[in-house]
Amino acid sequence: MTKKLFAALVAGCSFLAAAQAEVTVTEPWVRGTVPSQRASGAFMGLKSSSDVRLVGASSPAAKIVEVHEMSTSDGVMRMRAIEGLPLPAGKTVELKPGGHHVMLIDLVKPLLPGEQVPISLTFVGADGRKSTVEVKAMVRDLTSRGSSAHKH
């Protein structure tokens, strides 16, 4: 009886683990700021093992943290907060300058190159379950435009 109960418990735990999406974060970074600057963006690659949505974020570096998108309309770039960013299973979604990103608003202090900014990313799966991924994003120079791996 005990062996059957244990086997059922292990099978149940395996099912729950399989149902939880695994999100991989690659090259997280934040653009550095000047002393009077009150906001910055965080950028990274996100890949999930199952369909999820990035629905929020938080960081001790900023009082407000939002998921944003950039779009161009009639030659004018516009930025706005969005309720969620879909991550299709197995596909990498890039958060990058000029596109989707995590916006850090009302910064607690300037972000200096070489520092690390902790960011908590919140995801929701198709089943409604929330999960959080903790990230440490490296602060890059104010003029940085993207991947440090990019070479000419």
Model regions: which residues?
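Bacterial N-terminal signal peptides
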Residues: 7-17
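Positively charged n-region of N-terminal signal peptides that target proteins for export
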Residues: 1-5
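Compact, glycine-rich, soluble single-domain proteins
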Residues: 22-152
